[in-house]
């Protein structure tokens, strides 16, 4: 196995800028900005605009549009009497 070709996998804190929610996970992404976590250790901080805490799909605030099927659109367009 070649040495020094693998990315540095480390614990980092991701912060949702919309809600302020933070979570600690492992990542190869680095950051110059750091934050002190609940365990007293300092980790790199990565800010994200959307996470599972703010995304409508995960929060249950997603709105579904009624999608007509192909037959329904055909009947609507050409009229079924």
UniProtKB/Swiss-Prot annotation:
Keywords: Ribonucleoprotein, Ribosomal protein. GO terms for cellular component: ribonucleoprotein complex; ribosome. One of its GO terms (molecular function) is structural constituent of ribosome. One of its GO terms (biological process) is translation. The keyword Ribosomal protein applies. InterPro entries: Ribosomal_bL28/bL31-like_sf, Ribosomal_bL31, Ribosomal_bL31_B, Ribosomal_bL31_sf. It comes from the Bacteria. Part of the 50S ribosomal subunit. Belongs to the bacterial ribosomal protein bL31 family. Type B subfamily. This is Large ribosomal subunit protein bL31B. The lineage of its organism: Bacteria, Bacillati, Bacillota, Bacilli, Lactobacillales.
């Amino acid at each position: 196995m070649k040495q020094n070709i693998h990315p540095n996998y480390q614990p980092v804190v991701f912060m949702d800028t919309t809600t302020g929610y933070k979570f600690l996970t492992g990542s190869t992404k680095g950051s110059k900005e750091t934050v002190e976590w609940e365990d007293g250790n300092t980790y790199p901080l990565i800010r994200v605009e959307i996470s599972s805490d703010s995304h409508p799909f995960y929060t249950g605030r997603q709105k579904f549009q009624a999608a007509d099927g192909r037959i329904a659109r055909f009947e609507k367009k050409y009229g079924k009497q």
